[in-house]
């Protein structure tokens, strides 16, 4: 989501839009404030304090989410940390409820004439999502206690749902590429702690995770961080399902 390629059509769409739906917690800070500035839509403008959206047309999906990894102090020495906390809460399937509720509430506010329709659609969606969450909970039981490393520190919410214990990252620090010294220490740590799983988020190169797998015997699982990031992940439900199945496949005997 940090590396979305901007297109002129995005500005046109924002200029004409009644609302913009976004994850929030400044995860879109690389592109959303600039797009909102150029679009000059009075219903939505950039918030210089939070790097999010400000105005009646702004629909954030994050209100109500239990935010993880809120930093106590801010320093460039920590790498590219998120001041408002880890914004990748969409990787916990249970947060799908909150996301859907926030979208329905936002659309009802922006378009009150059709509020009943949005609430009806929310009820229908949750009726589909809730049984899937229960099913995924049972599937995820096989992942509880599995030790893993991820490429980037965007998986705490995934760990909270699955019970996977993430012990380190391939990156030296958030947004900072690994050094040979860090990788050597990571290999030692993985062997010592019997780390069985390497989680590669789809936006990162496969080379280093593959090398780590060769060195340690751990298996690599690829997960998507947003819809359409992997084949067959066009929706939140499909993304959650694909991620879970990829993890289970990697740790299967």
Give names to the regions the model predicted:
Residues 1-253:
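Extracytoplasmic metal-acquisition and chelation regions
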């Amino acid at each position: 989501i940090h590396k979305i390629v901007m297109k002129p059509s995005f500005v046109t769409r924002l200029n004409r839009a009644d609302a913009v739906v976004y994850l929030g917690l400044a995860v879109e800070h690389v592109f959303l404030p600039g797009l909102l500035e150029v679009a000059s839509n009075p219903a939505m403008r950039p918030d210089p304090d939070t790097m999010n959206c400000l105005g009646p047309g702004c629909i954030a999906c994050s209100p109500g989410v239990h935010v993880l990894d809120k930093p106590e102090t801010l320093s460039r020495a920590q790498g590219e940390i998120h001041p408002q906390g880890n914004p990748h809460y969409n990787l916990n399937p249970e947060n799908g409820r909150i996301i859907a509720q926030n979208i329905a509430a936002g659309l009802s506010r922006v378009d009150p004439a059709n509020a009943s329709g949005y609430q009806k659609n929310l009820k229908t969606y949750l009726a589909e999502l809730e049984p899937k969450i229960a099913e995924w909970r049972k599937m995820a039981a096989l992942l509880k206690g599995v030790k893993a490393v991820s490429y980037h520190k965007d998986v705490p919410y995934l760990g909270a749902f699955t019970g996977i214990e993430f012990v380190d990252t391939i990156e030296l620090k958030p947004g900072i590429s690994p050094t040979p010294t860090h990788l050597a220490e990571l290999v030692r740590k993985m062997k010592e702690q019997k780390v069985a799983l390497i989680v590669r988020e789809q936006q990162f190169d496969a080379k280093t995770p593959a090398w780590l797998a060769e060195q340690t015997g751990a298996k690599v699982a690829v997960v998507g961080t947003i819809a359409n990031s992997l084949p067959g992940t066009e929706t939140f439900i499909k993304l959650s399902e694909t991620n879970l199945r990829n993890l289970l496949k990697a740790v299967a005997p």
